């Protein structure tokens, strides 16, 4: 698929250009300034930085609708992990109203999962799934939301402070940014069996399984499908950190997320469908340039003939554009499954 670029003209940009064309106000002479006036009080205020994400607004499929059956979200806590010993985590399940336990459900896993649930915010996955499943635009799908691991403080064994935020050492970068199969093994050997132990029937068909995330969670989603396309064949990645945040020495070579375009080009095509998003004002730092990294991934997918969509907007490292695209991305990713 060809990359898509949304360039939305902005009235604010036009106003800014007009303002710059005006004659600047004359500077006040220091000798005429009141002694009680701060030295910088007469300076022209710095122009407010443009909010590149304001143009991305959630559509009707992200809003609760009357007469649409509502699924149920249940929250859990995992105290420890065999794959990542010493690290616990919060997790949750969304089960759609249409799931009756007789037929295996599709599965979608979200990284940084607790940020995707609920009727507010950028993502609203449960609301989007309620609407699309009810309209027959995606299959009956259980969503598994998983937070990255953290080592809880000994005085707070649940790993939560009074503000509800995780305490202790986060394992997020190690789990998400490492280009290894450790995280997908954690999903297949620990988390999905945990879901099944609660009585839910999950399809093992990779075409009926998807995985998604944003930022480091985005590269994590693609990485999981890359290592195990027999387990996940659909990927939703937004503002993906396909940069060298955490290089791993493999056979004498440092392999970080920035090496994925080369890996895609040098490997046989895998049965993975990808919906990817980034913004032209995404991050640039010591680890890389996010827009360039995501564009290189899209170029590699195109060259190898992958089934993909890549949307480059104008946003920053932010979830508003990805959240707006979520309903259409789900329709596109799940178009072959009902």
Q: Language-model segments: which ranges?
A:
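Positively charged n-region of N-terminal signal peptides that target proteins for export
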Residues: 1-6
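Bacterial N-terminal signal peptides
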Residues: 8-17
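Non-catalytic cap/lid and distal C-terminal segments of serine-dependent acyl enzymes
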Residues: 25-338
């Amino acid at each position: 698929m060809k990359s898509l670029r949304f360039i939305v003209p902005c009235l604010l940009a036009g106003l800014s250009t007009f303002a710059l064309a005006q004659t600047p106000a004359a500077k006040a002479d220091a000798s005429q300034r009141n002694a009680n006036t701060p030295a910088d009080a007469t300076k022209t205020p710095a122009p407010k930085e443009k909010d590149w994400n304001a143009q991305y607004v959630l559509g009707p499929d992200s809003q609760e609708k009357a007469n649409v059956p509502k699924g149920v979200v249940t929250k859990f806590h995992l105290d420890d992990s065999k794959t990542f010993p010493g690290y616990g985590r919060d997790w949750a399940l969304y089960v759609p109203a249409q799931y009756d336990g007789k037929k295996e459900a599709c599965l979608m896993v979200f990284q940084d999962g607790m940020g995707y649930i609920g009727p507010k915010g950028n993502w609203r996955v449960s609301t989007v799934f309620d609407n699309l499943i009810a309209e027959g635009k995606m299959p009956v799908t259980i969503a598994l939301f998983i937070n990255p691991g953290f080592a809880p403080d000994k005085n707070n064994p649940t790993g939560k402070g009074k503000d509800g935020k995780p305490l202790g050492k986060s394992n997020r970068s190690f789990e998400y940014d490492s280009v290894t199969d450790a995280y997908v093994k954690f999903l297949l050997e620990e988390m999905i069996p945990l879901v099944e132990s609660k009585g839910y029937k999950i399809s093992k068909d990779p075409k009926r399984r998807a995985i998604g995330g944003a930022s480091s969670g985005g590269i994590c989603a693609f990485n999981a499908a890359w290592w195990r396309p027999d387990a996940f064949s659909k990927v939703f990645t937004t503002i993906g950190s396909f940069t060298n945040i955490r290089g791993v020495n493999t056979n004498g070579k440092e392999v970080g997320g920035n090496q994925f375009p080369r890996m895609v080009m040098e490997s046989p095509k895998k049965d993975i469908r990808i919906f990817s998003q980034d913004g032209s004002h995404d991050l640039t730092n010591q680890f890389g340039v996010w827009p360039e990294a995501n564009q290189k991934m899209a170029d590699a997918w195109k060259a190898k003939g992958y089934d993909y969509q890549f949307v480059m907007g104008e946003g920053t490292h932010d979830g508003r554009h990805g959240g707006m695209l979520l309903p259409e991305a789900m329709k596109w990713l799940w178009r072959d499954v009902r």
